[in-house]
């Protein structure tokens, strides 16, 4: 009986204000269904002070409203394809008292390049996917790490298509592979400054971005049928893993890709 009580106590403490006193920057919030928003919600729940970015006027109102609902301290524009916006990001963060966590949830490829065979990927389409989905992580880490004087955590989101061939993922899978390699090199560069860099490989989740992948519903069905847990992962489960990695509980983890996919990635034939 005493053992059960101790376990409950630990579980209670685990989910109690794990990010209190920390400031977190979340890039990539697009709408209420985005994984970035789920992570921002979880960070707010755990006591983090939030900074959110949006890309372009089309998303400004939506992200500002979502930021207000979360009590975000700042909501500002950052287009990661523009060097002037990245320079402005550095300036904005410099005015903050501290920065403890960064979530990079940004990826894009032309729908045509996702749908066509990889061998037919255009040069421009390849470079676009790499620039937005992989290089932006390097640029954001450079801008943010200059303010992370007390150490911290930088997170990004990836997918199984980085190491396995996923139909209709194509050029994005290659971009995610580059992103995961970038995580390892960034972890090596920033580790001496006590800045941890990790990626979360989330299972398929119904987001607006996922609708751009042909036959995405079939991917969900396949995972549900074959994952050890016989279901798909939820945005909240991905967000809770992000909380762990951003908190002091994850202080010994860096340079890694952690899966939140109901175990699907372990399965063979």
For each predicted feature, which ranges?
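Short-chain dehydrogenase/reductase
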Residues: 4-125, 212
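Catalytic loop of short-chain dehydrogenase/reductase
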Residues: 28-37, 107-145, 150-192, 204-206, ...
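Aromatic pocket-lining residues of Rossmann-like dinucleotide-binding sites
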Residues: 43, 190, 245
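A glycine/serine/threonine-rich, flexible loop-to-helix segment
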Residues: 64, 192, 202-227, 237, ...
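Short, small/polar-rich loop/turn modules that mediate ligand/substrate recognition or access, typified
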Residues: 191, 196, 253-255
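Conserved SDR Rossmann-fold cofactor-binding beta-strand/turn motif
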Residues: 196-206, 246, 259-261
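A conserved structural motif in NAD(P)-dependent oxidoreductases
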Residues: 227-238, 249
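Short C-terminal tail/terminal secondary-structure segment
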Residues: 243, 254-269
């Amino acid at each position: 009986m005493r053992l059960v009580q101790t376990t409950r106590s630990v579980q209670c403490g685990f989910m109690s204000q794990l990010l209190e006193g920390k400031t977190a920057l979340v890039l990539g919030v697009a709408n209420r269904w985005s994984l970035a928003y789920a992570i921002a919600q979880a960070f707010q729940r755990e006591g983090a002070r939030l900074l959110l970015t949006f890309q372009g006027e089309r998303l400004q109102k939506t992200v500002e409203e979502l930021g207000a609902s979360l009590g975000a301290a700042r909501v500002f524009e950052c287009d990661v394809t523009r060097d002037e916006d990245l320079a402005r990001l550095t300036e904005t963060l410099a005015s903050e008292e501290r920065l403890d966590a960064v979530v990079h949830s940004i990826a894009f490829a032309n729908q045509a390049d996702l749908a066509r065979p990889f061998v037919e990927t255009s040069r421009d389409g390849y470079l676009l996917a790499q620039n937005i989905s992989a290089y932006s992580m390097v640029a954001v880490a450079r801008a943010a790490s200059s303010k992370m004087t007390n150490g911290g955590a930088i997170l990004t989101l990836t997918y199984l298509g980085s190491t396995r061939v996923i139909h209709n993922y194509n050029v994005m899978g290659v971009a995610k592979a580059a992103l995961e390699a970038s995580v390892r090199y960034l972890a090596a560069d920033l580790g001496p400054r006590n800045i941890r860099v990790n990626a979360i490989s989330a299972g398929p989740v119904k987001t607006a971005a996922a609708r751009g992948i042909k036959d995405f519903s079939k991917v969900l069905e396949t995972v549900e049928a074959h994952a050890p847990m016989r279901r798909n992962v939820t945005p909240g489960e991905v967000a809770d893993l992000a909380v762990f990695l951003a908190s002091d509980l994850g202080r010994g983890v860096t340079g890694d890709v952690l899966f939140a996919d109901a175990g699907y990635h372990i399965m063979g034939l």
